[in-house]
């Protein structure tokens, strides 16, 4: 929000310097980012009048001018601007003047003709970044008057960075309220004239979706003066507020928005068919906006429409077809209250930003609409003339914000801030904000909140207001006077710490990504899930809560792979959000991925790419470190994973996660030329409820037996291992490893050869060959019965 100091002083008569005011506002929560002069440094520039002109005899693009400066005789000026003409009042830099950039004006000859000064453009005076021709001043500008005095250029603009809760300060009036209460000064109310209608014309307004727009005010003004121009004083105030001038009616709309905080819009009445309908758009409706962009609307965009078509995106931007043009003679003015939830996020979704949307999505005063409309009418009539109709107001009281009243416990100021502030001081501060105290009982105030402070809803909000107005600098540092008891670390926190350290030691890099994700990416990875949509997203690419950890990891991986990272090893621990039947449930997860080359360049071995088994091996090592023995990798299909390289992870009989290679369809979509291997696990599934017990290492010898089987291709090593573990008695099987898998020549097409190594050992004695042979025979028989496996010699 850009605020002119001189404009602000019309509302509250303070005597602070620019630096003092900036510090005061910043300490009160309205952070001032910059304080800038409204014009460049220049001297001896006055208002002058061009009396007559004639072409330069030796230069086609130069003009000889006689200029009146209210002295005995006119000055001779050579000018190169195309818009110089007799009768024009201009900005004249006199001989000896200093202009921005260090230019000093001297008497000189241009192509042989005397020039006793310089007619200036707005750019040359530091009043605009771009301008065409010299400045054209009002016909009423006093000849000979210093330009700085005439345009009130000894002014500064405060650039205020407002927090989202302070929508009330998006206006001169709002900031003036703050300055008044901070300095205990009265607010100079600017009277708003109620304009009597001169004609009976009006438009019917239908609030079809009144929950989104519970109040809509409008007014017709006919027979505008097409020759009218925006007065210089208004154009200057708009410039200082960061808004360029367009058309007298549009400029008034923007002026009232800066002054009072109510965004408004003007329609060309001739382009409206019959009536105004405030409704949601139909999916597929199109609208060309004021900036020339054509948008295709979905079914949740609030629009202002007539009988047949949308005219504007409500609260965001008007349509080009119904915009006020140079030849517009009849207008319809709009001043409405839109529900902030309806506007929030829509502008960002369509890549739009406007001063209106910025204000509406934070919340405007729901009682301001008719006042702003009267103020705009008054200004338009004074500039462009015209015949106003009556104010048309449609509202639905059911959806208008009600008056906020509650019982404020003043003792909470001490409890929450540690400051003892007298009750009278609290009362004065609150009343300075416009809060009405209807009753005082002991330490309680019955308060009614003013309609413009939509952010004040409870005790804590009033405590914040009191302390910021009283002064944060009065908060004294005090030692904590309480007993502090160390908290307990939960099992989930312990496992998260262990797993994070374990993966870091394995060479993985931990990532931390937003819980907000790109809807397109998430729907591609989890098409079977429901997703939680954000009402007010940071951007359209971050508009859903994540239902899994993979979107963030994949986005980080793509970012790094595009920056010549040849090996990517990432993991992330975080919370995911499951939407189940409208209920939101949070789940702690860990996920990771591998992509690229395994290991560093090494003369003794060639590099290879990460594969499924690298990640599976890391997970098996993790499970071993956590003493999780009942873990299975069961081949299964997942929409985001390769059909032949994906598996469910089952821990203690419960589905706990997934592992696999990213589906080729997705790899192609992400323009990846290498496999990406991913996993995701519920963090709680890694918590081992059993307490580890000491067990001595066996001093008896281990015995290894190798077996080679011919099996059907669809049978997994996990299935074979499960049968073997169930067959071997007691705790003899210490390890089970697959050391060879072969499919090809000499093997039937529907078969494969698997060779496994088993390590057998007893903790209390030495195993003898006879009992080992019986065990091996039992294993072979069981496998033959279960899977028709054939033992290979």
Curated annotation (Swiss-Prot):
Keyword terms, alphabetized: Aminoacyl-tRNA synthetase, ATP-binding, Cytoplasm, Ligase, Magnesium, Metal-binding, Nucleotide-binding, Protein biosynthesis, RNA-binding, tRNA-binding
Cofactor note: Binds 2 magnesium ions per tetramer.
Domain FDX-ACB residue range list: 698-792
Organism superkingdom: Bacteria
CDD domains per UniProt: PheRS_beta_core, tRNA_bind_bactPheRS
Cofactors (names): Mg(2+)
GO terms assigned for molecular function: ATP binding; magnesium ion binding; phenylalanine-tRNA ligase activity; tRNA binding
Binding site for Mg(2+): 455, 461, 464-465
Pfam families xrefs: B3_4 (PF03483), B5 (PF03484), FDX-ACB (PF03147), tRNA_bind (PF01588), tRNA_synthFbeta (PF17759)
Sequence ranges assigned to domain tRNA-binding in this UniProt record: 39-148
SMART domains: B3_4, B5, FDX-ACB
HAMAP family according to UniProt: Phe_tRNA_synth_beta1 (MF_00283)
GO CC, any one term: phenylalanine-tRNA ligase complex
Reactions catalysed according to its record: tRNA(Phe) + L-phenylalanine + ATP = L-phenylalanyl-tRNA(Phe) + AMP + diphosphate + H(+)
Protein family according to the UniProt entry: Belongs to the phenylalanyl-tRNA synthetase beta subunit family. Type 1 subfamily.
Protein name: Phenylalanine--tRNA ligase beta subunit
Domain (B5): residue spans on this chain: 401-477
The keyword Ligase appears for this protein: yes
Enzyme Commission number, as recorded: 6.1.1.20
Subunit structure, as described in the record: Tetramer of two alpha and two beta subunits.
GO biological process terms on file: phenylalanyl-tRNA aminoacylation
Compartments in which it is found: Cytoplasm
